[in-house]
A protein has these predicted regions:
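P-loop NTPase switch module centered on the Walker A-proximal segment
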Residues: 2-130
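Conserved ATP-binding subdomain of kinase catalytic cores across diverse folds
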Residues: 112-183
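Conserved, well-structured beta-alpha core segment at the onset of a catalytic domain
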Residues: 1-13, 172-179, 183
Length: 183
């Protein structure tokens, strides 16, 4: 672990291209604070408004059904825990984070090519957590939206399964119909 003098050093990467060296330090209230150290390229993620905002937007909203319990269960409810467990991975882009001295590569962590945790997928969808040992990353921790949902990798591709409200459960159908109309 790249920890020096009470701070942990990290690298923001785009696939295997290092983009930003940054660190996290705990303040007097034991809250993590993130600081940019050095940009390693002239490129920036689209819409970049600073490191704390960038990292925060990669995390699933706490109000999403079942997600807060999952975040707490796997140590992702704290921003630094979220980085250590999920590497801030997303299915929306190819940015990710690792500790500065970690040998991890994009090939080892990519959500596009590596299997998803079925346990986490099911817990994100139905709220039932059957195990406490997290062995792989999962797109559930970084998926936006209010209703319960999960990602499944099948032979023909990656699919998002969604539920709707408790009363009518028509939101996924409405989204499907809207997509059909837009074509």
């Amino acid at each position: 672990m790249a920890t020096h003098g009470g701070k942990t050093d990290y690298i923001l990467l785009n696939k295997d291209l290092p983009m930003l060296a940054f660190h996290c330090r705990r303040n007097e209230f034991d809250e993590p604070e993130f600081f940019e150290d050095q940009w390693l390229t002239a490129l920036r993620p689209i819409g970049y408004r600073g490191l704390p905002a960038f990292l925060d937007q990669r995390k699933a909203p706490k109000h999403r059904k079942h997600i807060q319990q999952l975040l707490e269960q796997y140590g992702c409810d704290d921003p630094e825990g979220f980085l250590r467990i999920t590497h801030a991975l997303s299915l929306n882009d190819t940015f990710w984070v690792r500790e500065a001295d970690s040998p991890l590569t994009w090939q080892e962590v990519s959500l596009y090519t590596n299997p998803f945790s079925e346990i986490i997928s099911e817990a994100a969808f139905d709220g039932i957590i059957s195990e406490t040992d997290l062995s792989s990353t999962s797109p559930e921790f970084g998926t936006d939206g209010y209703y319960a949902k999960c990602w499944k990798r099948e032979e023909s591709g990656v699919y998002l399964y969604k539920s709707g409200s408790a009363h009518y459960e028509i939101e996924p159908l409405s989204e499907y119909l809207a997509a059909q109309l837009s074509e």
